[in-house]
């Protein structure tokens, strides 16, 4: 009988378990989870009776097949929401990604348009700072990207950010004509269930053996064996990994860099905090926080009060992989050392800044290969 061991019970691990079980009814599938619950940051928590996830875990995708997969198991409610950033130097909120409609209202619009017209002498940008200076100019860079990315990634200079910056830093086009044109071709949704995604994790692992509080200490790729800190070990024919790959090799090549988040829940004595279709706000200046989220907008929780979550980048956890080429090279070095029959998926496993839909897509691809 083929033995499959899955490391990590977040979205990627649960999706892989569900899809592999559907395809192979008789395989022995074990999922090892570090904590005592499945779902990781997508699992519903409570503060003052208010349900919330760790950050705004809305389902956002350009792929209808990932939406249909999840919606069939866990009915989703489609969302229409606006994205805004507070720019302290202007004492104003603007849509993000940026728009010419907003630029026309800025006090320094003449300078901005002149910078956009002149461009820079940077021919081939090789990092986030140069990319923004070339595409948007100094003023817009400082308003929207300079300080936000320095605090988001905990770096002294955005020149350190030299991988994929033209994709993740702009969330689409750099500047749109009108406000709110971003994500017009994507599906945004959230579960109708009051417990959010929790039922999905139960459904996905219904026929899977789950072992909780299992801290992986290393993997012997030659013997195909996973060793845990409690001295237990599990042999495998196929290994699905969703945790940081440096852990599997005892960080023999060095530790991969991540950024974490300090999450601060705050209940306010009002029914609604943010207006209209605004679910969360970004803060792009020198303030320590990067985002606030109003969770009732997602959960539709009924209360005379409302819960917001304040997010401050920190070294607390491994929530964001680093968009730095040297870190990606280190990741690939670990992958090359793993041998056959190992599949790395999820944000930590693939060392990519990805979301729920990507995890589902990766799980689908793995299931199709084995």
Write out the residue ranges for each language-model feature.
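A short, Lys/Arg-enriched amphipathic alpha-helix followed by its capping loop at the start of a domain
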Residues: 15-27, 204-207
């Amino acid at each position: 009988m083929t033995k499959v061991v899955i490391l990590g019970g977040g979205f990627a691990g649960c999706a892989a378990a569900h899809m592999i079980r559907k395809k192979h009814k008789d395989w022995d599938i074990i999922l090892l989870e570090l904590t005592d619950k499945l779902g990781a940051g997508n699992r519903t928590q409570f503060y003052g009776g208010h349900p919330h996830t760790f950050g705004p875990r809305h389902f956002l995708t350009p792929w209808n097949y990932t939406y249909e997969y999840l919606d069939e198991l866990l009915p989703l409610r489609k969302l229409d929401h606006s994205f805004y950033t507070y720019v302290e130097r202007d004492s104003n909120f603007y849509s993000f990604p940026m728009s010419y409609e907003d630029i026309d209202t800025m006090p320094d619009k003449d300078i901005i348009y002149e910078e956009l017209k002149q461009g820079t002498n940077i021919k081939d940008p090789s990092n986030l700072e140069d990319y923004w200076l070339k595409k948007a100019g100094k003023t817009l860079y400082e308003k929207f990207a300079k300080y936000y990315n320095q605090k988001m990634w905990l770096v002294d200079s955005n020149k350190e950010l030299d991988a994929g910056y033209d994709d993740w830093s702009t969330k689409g086009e750099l500047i749109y004509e009108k406000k709110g044109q971003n994500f017009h071709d994507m599906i945004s949704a959230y579960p109708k269930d009051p417990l959010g995604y929790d039922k999905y994790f139960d459904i996905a692992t219904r026929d899977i053996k789950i072992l909780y509080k299992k801290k992986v200490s290393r993997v012997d790729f030659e013997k195909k064996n996973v060793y845990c800190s409690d001295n237990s070990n599990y042999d495998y024919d196929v290994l699905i990994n969703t945790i940081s790959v440096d852990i599997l090799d005892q960080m023999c090549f060095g530790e991969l860099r991540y950024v974490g988040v300090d999450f601060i829940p705050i209940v306010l004595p009002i029914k609604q905090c943010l207006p209209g279709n605004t679910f969360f706000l970004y803060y792009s200046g020198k303030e320590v926080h990067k985002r606030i989220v109003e969770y009732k907008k997602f959960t539709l929780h009924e209360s005379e009060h409302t819960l917001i979550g304040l997010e401050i980048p920190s070294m607390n956890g491994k929530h964001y992989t680093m968009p730095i080429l040297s870190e990606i090279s280190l990741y690939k070095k670990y992958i090359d050392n793993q041998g056959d029959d190992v599949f790395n998926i999820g944000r930590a496993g693939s060392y990519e800044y990805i979301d729920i839909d990507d995890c589902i897509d990766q799980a689908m691809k793995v299931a199709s290969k084995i």
